[in-house]
Amino acid sequence: MAVRIYSDSLFLTDELDRMKKVAIQGYRGCFHEQASREFYSEMGEDIRIVACPTFEPLFKAMEDGAADAAVMAIENTISGGLIPNFELLRSYPFRIKGEVYIRIEQNLMALPGQRIEDIRQVRTHYMAINQTRKFFEENCPWITVVEHEDTAKAAIEIASEGLMGVGAVASSLAAEQNGLQILAPGIETYKQNFTRFLILDDSLTVPKNRIDKATLCFTLPHKPGSLAQILTILSFYDMNLTRIQSLPIPGHEWQYFFYVDIKFSTYARYRQALKAARPLMKDLNVLGEYKSAQ
């Protein structure tokens, strides 16, 4: 497993060792890092970033002790859920302890001293291409947009290789960390573009009186009305169903895992709802009980 540990601090080694190591998917300056720093700064904690190439190494890093926690994207308001990540949550023992929402602002950046007219090629991730296509078509059609594996890595390469005439579309954090100049901020087509990130950190304890959200995974008997019964119970106990995702159970035709997010006003009422619904469920797995992000 390849991981990279980053820190912006110039602390002594023992101070660095005391900083919480947070695993993320992506490269220095990516939106995962932005989400991680936003969440932990509110907690008053300094962190070191453990960068992983894909999502499963986040969990491996926590298992191996290379990371103390992980921050993982789970859904986006435009592209929907990251389906493989639901399976990772079910497959590993780490519980959700919080969440954070980040508005995805895409910025066109390049080495300082250039104008948009000087840029001939832009590198970025395919999702960022889809989110910014209209800007390039309407404002700078001479630029060739090239798909890259990661938004932040594109910015890193431009800075490290001194590439003139080449731009990247990435976060403002990527521009700041790599000394790039933002030529055009906020070039995404849809401004209401948010990604939800989950906090997986066993060191965090959330008081019960502050818990107002839970993520569950369960299966149901393969018979008519089984899901409707669960939804009726949740409604009776005033549970707000904010997300439901079904995924096939391998080896079981037309049977599914159900992943559910529910919000509630009191923890006791939530536990009552869970107690009432549990006899109708199979293989209930509480993936996390936490304070929702406002």
Task: List where the protein language model places each region.
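Domain-level signature for soluble enzymes in the chorismate/prephenate branch of the shikimate pathway
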Residues: 2-294
